[in-house]
């Protein structure tokens, strides 16, 4: 079950609360509507709201993507946590269309990557766009991926 909340009438802004539609941002990002940018800004490897401008090359994450893609999610729902992985994928495909809208802030339950980005109840979620929540949080999940390069010496 997902919820859609209007957070502003003029301009129209919304938060779509995906609940357990996904368990990680990599299940619904990137997409053809919201591709991995050439430069991820702010960098997911730097704390949100850092005083310095932070940029990270998108190619760093595209290189570790299972399909080397900038337009397909990093992972698909699978395993016993999903009753029906096919239905989960269909639901996520619909969710990604909300996620790509500039006036919609898409979030899922238990998203650790947003803990230092959003404010919590009883503070209001109105003004999320002005507060920069979407821009600060959109690619934060990428910090969960190991971008280190391993090298093997020839034996």
Describe the predicted segments one by one:
Residues 1-4:
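Short beta-strand scaffold segments in enzyme catalytic cores
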Residues 8-155:
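Cap/insert and terminal regions of metallo-dependent hydrolase folds
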């Amino acid at each position: 079950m997902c919820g859609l909340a209007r957070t502003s009438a003029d301009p129209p802004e919304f938060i779509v609360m995906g609940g357990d539609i996904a368990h990680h941002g990599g299940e619904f990002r990137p997409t053809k509507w919201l591709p991995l940018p050439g430069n991820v800004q702010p960098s997911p490897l730097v704390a949100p709201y850092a005083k310095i401008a932070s940029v990270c090359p998108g190619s760093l994450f595209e290189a570790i993507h299972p399909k080397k893609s900038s337009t397909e999610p990093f992972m698909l729902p699978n395993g016993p946590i999903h009753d029906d992985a096919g239905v989960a994928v269909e639901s996520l495909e619909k969710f990604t269309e909300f996620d790509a809208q500039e006036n919609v802030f898409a979030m899922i339950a238990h998203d650790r990557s947003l803990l230092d980005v959003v404010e919590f109840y009883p503070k209001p979620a109105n003004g999320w766009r002005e507060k920069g929540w979407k821009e600060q949080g959109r690619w934060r999940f990428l910090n969960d991926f190991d971008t280190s390069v391993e090298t093997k010496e020839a034996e």
